Amino acid sequence: MIKKVVLTGGPSSGKTTVLKSIVKEFNKHFVKVIVVPETATELITAGVRMFGEDKIDALDFQELVIRTMIFKEDNYYRAAEMYEKLYPNQDVLIILDRAIMDNLAYVGDEKFIEVLNRLGLNGDYSQIYNRYDLVINLVN
């Protein structure tokens, strides 16, 4: 069985601590855990950003983030299917450090829908919600 869980929350809400605890606990129970790193941080670290002197447009940045997130989510799910095939008695847990909906906070509803439309999602939030089995929102 493969499950996709999103770990989200504001700065200093404890995501890193909770993530480490989840991985440790599930590994004890022989569950294969795959952690999908936060996409925006990867892009920013690589030099692609929507702030500073060499910034790109905020909507273009969000499109890159969401497009990359979708690719990564699908790719890691495929890896989980490979594990499931090789080890049919072992469950797989995919933990995502943030999810597509987190990007709404950076551009607002109208612009977010515009980005979704660019990606062929037609502003349909249900297509996004249905990608996950559980969302854990940590608050500080």
What are these regions (language model features)?
Residues 70-112:
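A basic- and aromatic-enriched beta-loop-alpha substructure that forms the phosphate/nucleotide-
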Residues 15:
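Conserved lysine of the Walker
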Residues 18:
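Hydrophobic positions on the alpha1 helix immediately C-terminal to the Walker A/P-loop
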Residues 96-140:
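ATP-dependent NMP and nucleoside kinases share a basic, alpha-helical "lid"
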Residues 23-68:
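Conserved substrate/cofactor phosphate-moiety recognition/catalytic segment
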Residues 11:
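The conserved Walker
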Residues 7:
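Hydrophobic anchor at the beta1->P-loop junction of P-loop NTPases
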Residues 1-4:
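Extreme N-terminal, non-catalytic leader segments
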